[in-house]
């Protein structure tokens, strides 16, 4: 099997991202991990944590080779100003965004096989005057993808979302037949092309309690969700089950048969997933022309430089990126 080349962006330099990357370097990996970062930042963080890491330059003209324990392959970027653990500095926001831009470009060109992203701080990037609503939106805009899908995965459960980071008061209006068509088509296509699932089984949550109770607890199921699902079944022969009440759907008898659960909004699906696999789940962006996975946590500024950050989610994100890239 050909060795894959995975881009890794540590994210916010004052957060735990650099800590996690130098901790991950303590073990061997079956892919080449190209870390897009300032090597001085990583060296400083490794020293602070008492870890030994040897840096080697990224050589794009050479064939990728598995990452040896104790090493990191570096695509170098320079911080604008020195970073203090736990202290945000807007001067370094452009650095963070530039690492993402590079990783996205090289994935689109085929130089990299996937990208794994560490946590960023949206607030400090916007404070620097750079419009930034998140990794997902950044990569989607860069790749000219009008629609992408956020899916989180842990052992035995994958949950995709129809709506993501919007206020709960706006969710019902955001769920339209057109949006459901776009989301489910992307979900179905990527489960086939990236996950190698021949006929994906998609289980869909209702929006309202009891999936609307025949319209007595809301009409979104009757007016929007059921018609959209029926159209997709009829036109594309998709294997879709639902809409089912969310409190019913998240039971073993349904989950054991589902390749993915489609939740209508963020806090409908993700609490169940994080309860089942907190610290061991991974965020996957579907609909991009390449594989992108991410940790499921934030920058944890208070833990930066302490050695107390849990690498579990980053390990899962890397393993998932390697697994998916090996199928493509």
Curated annotation (Swiss-Prot):
It holds the Pfam family PdxA. Keywords: Cobalt, Cytoplasm, Magnesium, Metal-binding, NAD, NADP, Oxidoreductase, Pyridoxine biosynthesis, Zinc. Signal peptide: none annotated. Belongs to the PdxA family. The keyword NADP applies. One of its GO terms (molecular function) is 4-hydroxythreonine-4-phosphate dehydrogenase activity. Homodimer. The keyword Hydrolase does not apply. The gene is pdxA. This is 4-hydroxythreonine-4-phosphate dehydrogenase. It is found in: Cytoplasm. The active site is located at the dimer interface.
